[in-house]
A protein has these predicted regions:
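Short amphipathic alpha-helical segment within the helicase RecA-like ATPase core
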Residues: 1-266, 271, 284
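Alpha-helical metal-binding/catalytic segments enriched in His/Glu/Asp
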Residues: 205, 276-287
Length: 287
């Protein structure tokens, strides 16, 4: 899904759907939600008073505009209780409304910056969380099956503050990068073991190292034995695939006071414990 940021009035955006929001137990509309409600002759306010729109976290209420707006539909996303709101909620809300609108055959959507200005949530953080949540919310591993729904092709994040476009663009790009990286890991996890072998993992690591100028080291069985990695090698004996220990590292041009290390299990074959686990937990063994 392509994401872009514009500065403008969401009521004037041409799209299959535009997304505004509402906190739980708050009947007073403000901001873009009030603007959209006015264009719809008070429809949102009426549905709130009738109890059809409640603003509960994860709730997505759909209103057809019937030509009153350039957009075909309005989605009112529930933000939950204001006192519990934060960036994790923004991510969840973005995923929820994207999944709902995909099911309604929406290919182009536009959304406001949810949560911007509330507590310590700034424009950049909001844009980042929306991008991350929407892309991860739409994730589906469809390599071996036909997708159930067509993807949303474009999402427009609509800001209102002139001069803040670059800030919001920086935010959504951060979220996009995080989501792309997470999607790659999910793809690797979801591949069957006979496809995602240690050798294939090393190939992917090599591709990443070349693309992003990372240092790559791949250790074989002999080198791991010399390092005393008996437990790892013991598990690897259950497979006909040779094990690999992969190290990817990145060093900035200038010295940094902090070093960050991420260690992943990275075992593509491990049947230990499946037979002694309750049946409802077996599905989780894949990851």
């Amino acid at each position: 899904m392509e994401i872009k940021v514009i500065i403008g009035d969401i009521t004037q955006v041409e799209a299959d759907a535009i997304v505004v929001n509402l906190f739980e137990e708050e009947e007073q509309l403000g901001g873009a939600t009030a603007d959209v409600d006015k264009a719809l002759d008070g429809t949102i306010a009426r549905l709130i008073s009738q109890g059809e729109i409640r603003g509960k976290l994860g709730e997505v209420s759909i209103i057809h505009t019937l030509g009153k707006l350039p957009a075909r539909m309005v989605a009112v996303a529930g933000l939950g209780k204001r006192e519990d709101f934060g960036l994790d909620k923004v991510r969840r809300v973005a995923g929820e409304f994207c999944r709902s609108l995909r099911k309604l055959n929406c290919h182009k959507i536009a959304t406001v910056l949810h949560g911007a200005g509330i507590d310590d949530i700034d424009l950049e953080s909001s844009a980042e969380a929306i991008a991350e949540g929407s892309l991860l919310g739409l994730y589906s591993f469809d390599k071996y099956k036909k997708p159930e729904y067509k993807d949303i092709e474009q999402m427009i994040i609509v800001g209102k503050e002139e001069g803040k476009l670059s800030v919001e663009e920086r935010g959504y790009r951060k979220g996009e990068i995080i989501a792309e990286a997470t999607g790659l890991v999910r793809d690797m996890v979801n591949e069957p073991g006979n496809s995602m072998t240690p050798t294939r993992m090393a190939e992917i690591a090599s591709e990443l190292a070349e693309r992003y100028n990372l240092k790559l080291e791949v250790f074989d069985s002999k080198e791991m034995e010399e390092m005393g990695m008996g437990a790892f090698l013991g598990v690897a004996k259950g497979s006909n695939q040779a094990p690999k220990l992969i190290s990817l590292s990145y060093k900035r041009d200038k010295d940094s006071e902090n070093a960050i290390g991420l260690i992943g299990k990275g075992v593509t074959f491990d049947s230990g414990g499946i037979s002694i686990k309750p049946s409802e937990g077996m599905g989780e063994m894949k990851t």
